[in-house]
Amino acid sequence: MATQIDASSEAAAATAAAQHTPMMQQYLRIKSEHPDTLVFYRMGDFYELFFEDAEKAARLLDLTLTQRGASAGTPIKMAGVPHHAVEQYLAKLVKFGESAAICEQIGDPATSKGPVERKVVRVVTPGTLTDAALLSDKSDVFLLALCVGHNKRGVASNIGLAWLNLASGALRLAELAPDQLGAALERIRPAEILAADGTIESVPAGMGAITRVPAWHFDIASGTQRLCDQLEVASLDGFGAQALTSANGAAGALLIYAAATQGQQLRHVRSLKVENESEYIGLDPSTRRNLELTETLRGTESPTLYSLLDTCCTAMGSRLLRHWLHHPPRASVAAQARHQAIGALLDAPPNAGLDSLRSALRQIADVERITGRLALLSARPRDLSSLRDTFAALPALRERVAEIASNAAALGRLGAALEPPPGCLDLLTRAIAAEPAAMVRDGGVIARGYDAELDELRDISENCGQFLIDLETRERARTGISNLRVEYNKVHGFYIEVTRGQTDKVPDDYRRRQTLKNAERYITPELKTFEDKALSAQERALARERALYDGVLQALLPHIEGCQRVASGLAELDLLAAFAERARTLDWVAPEFTDEIGIEIDQGRHPVVEAQVEQFIANDCALNPERKLLLITGPNMGGKSTFMRQTALIALMAYVGSYVPAKAARFGPIDRIFTRIGAADDLAGGRSTFMVEMTEAAAILNDATPHSLVLMDEIGRGTSTFDGLALAWAIARHLLSHNRCYTLFATHYFELTQLPAEFPQAANVHLSAVEHGHGIVFLHAVEEGPANQSYGLQVAQLAGVPAPVIRAARKHLAHLEQQSAAQATPQLDLFAAPTVVDEPECNEPPAAATPHPALERLLELDPDDLKPRDALDLLYELHTLARSGPADAQR
């Protein structure tokens, strides 16, 4: 029965296929292999898209949608792009999260019977970009696979991640708890995520394009073996991955997918890094956003810490900077080595110092990405010429580094890495033209002298006329026929023409080609050989050049690891030189590290804000076991958030390996940095501002340790005054008594300033400001002790709130203050022992205080709006009111 069904299905499929033209049958077969991908089908000088693909491409790429004929009764919708411009369209597609299969003609149209043979040669997806036209110079593109591990009860116990930068070949693995997935994805920022059905819902929204992959691709045993095969090792012990489970399953799925998109092996994936949470200072998504490391809160790339630090001379250095900022090591040893290298660069003599080194680095190509394209055999001619020129510049660069490296081991290590693989420079110099064409198909890529056959073909093509002149001269001398001519026409090709009176002198090797009335035309073996070459010389030269170029790529494959080593050394050297330039230009200093708990910053400055203003007020920050929490008060716009952020940024910069904006800085161990600064509704997640605020606070209270740095800004402001005050007090108390972390706690609840009376480890500081008339001048200086008021009305006035609103607010504020004084209900009771009040007293309403009419009148007026005569009249009015009491005024 099953056989009959199969036979019927095959017959139905054959009947359906017969309704299409042979070309459409070919297209539909290829499309069936890539159902979720836009198929770019090569037809002559265009890539065509058909049916639904054409409709989608026309919409996304703004192409003209046409309709030509029908296939199986269905109109064929078409859209196309020129083959020479396809990369720019692919770049647009991947930005939309789409993938494209590039289907090329691989058969010869002249010999093909039916449609020319076609094949998908590569698949372009958001996470597998390697072409320079599709990549941002200063950002990496990651393909990530996600595998959920389950315990015996079937409950998710861990999540394995594997992510690959295909352009460089860098592969990383990690295993983490399910609740850490969001933070990990926020840090990695993959362009594409591979997940099996059933695990896709684990991926937070907005984290990248999601591609469904068969569940069997994530098999752990198969993944482990595939990793070993890829790295050419017997086990993963040497990479620290022997204990991993779900991460190895993710790696297996990732390698299958990446190799399939490229249609070949991933020769440049030869190393593996297992990331452990304990290696780096923890930065949750909120902290990365609030500190504006690589992106502002508005979503722009500048001004950020990254944009300030990125004066790198190479794209490799810029990408490494981005990685370092998101991966600050916990161990201070790495940072100290970087500081030592920066110091050596700054102390070097001018002729061999920082400026000279950076000038040389500006001539360096993007070796990392060129190497990736080499490994995938997709490097273009100018990639190779850039690689050649870079390798040629390395000896001089190594000499400069060697002159500086005597006082810095890190520089010595980097200098040793700047040794091009043996034979590479010689091969590239001999093989590649000084200024090659952009594409191999254009010719002019292989250097003269590299291949005798190619040189001859080029000579034939370029110097055909000269060959004929030389041959004519030689044949006249050999035969003694003075009027012998060597010529060419399109009908008969090349020939030697001899007049009838001279035919008796024709040598035996002449073969008659054509007889004319007054002359005979001949061909010789030499001329025939030349003719065969000349008529196809250009075509054959291009084919020979293509073959030679492919041979050069193959010859470079064994040197991939050496090229990667050079790229890594260049990137780190460039970044350290950029750090040195920033330190010199912006007057930064080398921080110190200690094993003792504490943070000491002398005259610290916010690096990004300082670059935006003419003058920046530097401030000290001291946190230690006796001073674990700073309660920061002061007016809005007074600089509380800036002070808090600058403390975190200076600490982060120190551990990244940069010098810091301060007069001096000293840091104890730091394991994590938390921030609770600002908040907004999470509409997509159905969370209010206050819920977002409390969720972030809960994460801090649950995870902060005595080595964590916590920034809390106005916690509790998203709810009612007393609820917020109670929560802020309880949270501050918990941070002091349980977490015992370094804490900067900014608040407008002045009642909290009594906390140091209960906890000696807490201290009050404030951002100073002075009143000037009804205005305010922010001094931005951090001073000991609490602030005396918040200056809210003055800040509102600065913001442009209309004068009548300010006057009304002042009037109501005075009323509230008088009412509060009359009620005599001290707000500080929140921290004092509870006072027992008799029930009748609690039910008696307080007497309402009546403000003096003169004060009310003063609060109503705006001195800036008064004319001289009005002011005089008002003065008499106020004098009268002042002499009378409230009761008299009411009468």
From Swiss-Prot:
Binding site for ATP: 634-641
UniProt GO cellular component terms: cytosol
One biological process term in Gene Ontology: mismatch repair
Keyword Magnesium attached: no
InterPro entries: DNA_mismatch_repair_MutS (IPR005748), DNA_mismatch_repair_MutS-lik_N (IPR007695), DNA_mismatch_repair_MutS/MSH (IPR017261), DNA_mismatch_repair_MutS_C (IPR000432), DNA_mismatch_repair_MutS_clamp (IPR007861), DNA_mismatch_repair_MutS_core (IPR007696), DNA_mismatch_repair_MutS_N (IPR016151), DNA_mismatch_repair_MutS_sf (IPR036187)
Top-level taxonomic group: Bacteria
Entry-linked Pfam families: MutS_I (PF01624), MutS_II (PF05188), MutS_III (PF05192), MutS_IV (PF05190), MutS_V (PF00488)
Keywords (A to Z) from UniProt: ATP-binding, DNA damage, DNA repair, DNA-binding, Nucleotide-binding
Biological function: This protein is involved in the repair of mismatches in DNA. It is possible that it carries out the mismatch recognition step. This protein has a weak ATPase activity.
Family (UniProt): Belongs to the DNA mismatch repair MutS family.
Name under which the protein is recorded: DNA mismatch repair protein MutS
Organism: Burkholderia pseudomallei (strain 668)
